[in-house]
A protein has these predicted regions:
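An N-terminal alpha-helical hairpin/helix-loop-helix interaction module that forms a charged
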Residues: 1-66, 82-152
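Cytochrome P450 catalytic-core helices
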Residues: 73-78
């Protein structure tokens, strides 16, 4: 999965480096692999799995940069299940929600409450732009990115 993600532009370079450093050691790689497998394929409610995944990422070995960031905890499920899961870039998403008039419940500490709020925001956007026929949450994420980015 780390190789798959490295082919995207979803994570900033400092996040990619922090992840690579975290999984260099056998124990870091094992912790990451088991945690990611449980998050993607484990049993139980998504909220509980998400919280466990955040704990795993928070426990990964680190050098200088923190590994536990919103982009890092959301990117892998977004790649694996774009029909139902979305990716969070905090600044852009917060600005997009503000522009959209959506009360996005954001916390800088990754956790289920914020992610559940993001999924609600995605559902609202999907409903509102249904005539544009978004195929999945990649399309919704793209819409959010354009709305919240000052580049467009």
């Amino acid at each position: 999965m780390v190789r798959i993600e490295s082919q995207t532009n979803l994570l900033f370079s400092f996040e990619k480096m922090a992840l690579r450093d975290a999984v260099k050691s056998p124990e870091g790689a094992r912790l990451f692999a088991r945690g990611l497998y449980d998050f993607l394929h484990g049993r139980g409610q998504l909220g509980k799995k998400f919280e466990r995944w955040c704990e795993v990422v928070g426990e990964l070995p680190r050098r200088q940069k923190r590994v536990l960031t919103w982009p890092l905890v959301t990117v892998f499920r977004f790649i694996a299940s774009p029909e139902t899961q979305i990716f969070l870039k905090p600044n852009v998403t917060r600005e997009a929600a503000k522009e959209y008039g959506f009360d996005f419940r954001y916390s800088s500490q990754p956790g289920w409450e914020t992610y559940a709020s993001l999924l609600e925001f995605a559902d609202v956007v999907r409903r509102d732009i249904r005539e544009m026929r978004p195929r999945d949450l990649i399309d919704i994420q793209s819409f959010i990115w354009v709305l919240g980015s000052n580049e467009y």
